[in-house]
């Protein structure tokens, strides 16, 4: 597959939506087609990115980390990820499967933190220079159900400790973004796992068919 141009597939959604499971499923489906893949996550995916992740997610920084600082840290991590991991992999013909990307910032910082979307978009244009995923799957889940699932994983991190109203704002913003960007594929993640996986498989198989 090295002779082919790689693709970037992003999995988005609230906590507890099943993003990690979806990433693994996408990798399996691509592997069946002999497509070389790598996985990554946001924030993180590089040495610097993981350091920034530890700051952003650390509960010790509750009420300490300014929203603007958080936003800048996220973009710093994203730049490192794009330049050090994603672009090199795509240039080698690999398909990159990412747990979160730009849409998360718009939803969490723009929606959850109520930050000015114009500022975020300007920062995005400066940092990403138009770089976009080839496919985004948004796993849509009720915030209450998502947090119940997330809680079963263990202790909450700094973001997961936010109020349920915070996650409802994110959820609402995701829906607005999906309506504004019809290329984003929304999948109902409130359903049983096998139904969610079946929907993901259908989307991925169609995407593969049109890109091989």
UniProtKB/Swiss-Prot annotation:
Its EC number is 2.7.4.9. ATP binds at residues 13-20. The keyword DNA repair does not apply. One of its GO terms (biological process) is dUDP biosynthetic process. CDD domains: TMPK. It catalyses: dTMP + ATP = dTDP + ADP. Keywords: ATP-binding, Kinase, Nucleotide biosynthesis, Nucleotide-binding, Transferase. Gene3D superfamilies: P-loop containing nucleotide triphosphate hydrolases. It comes from the Bacteria. One of its GO terms (molecular function) is dTMP kinase activity. One of its GO terms (cellular component) is cytosol. InterPro entries: P-loop_NTPase, Thymidylate_kin-like_dom, Thymidylate_kinase. Pfam families: Thymidylate_kin. Belongs to the thymidylate kinase family. Phosphorylation of dTMP to form dTDP in both de novo and salvage pathways of dTTP synthesis. This is Thymidylate kinase. It comes from Legionella pneumophila (strain Corby). The gene is tmk.
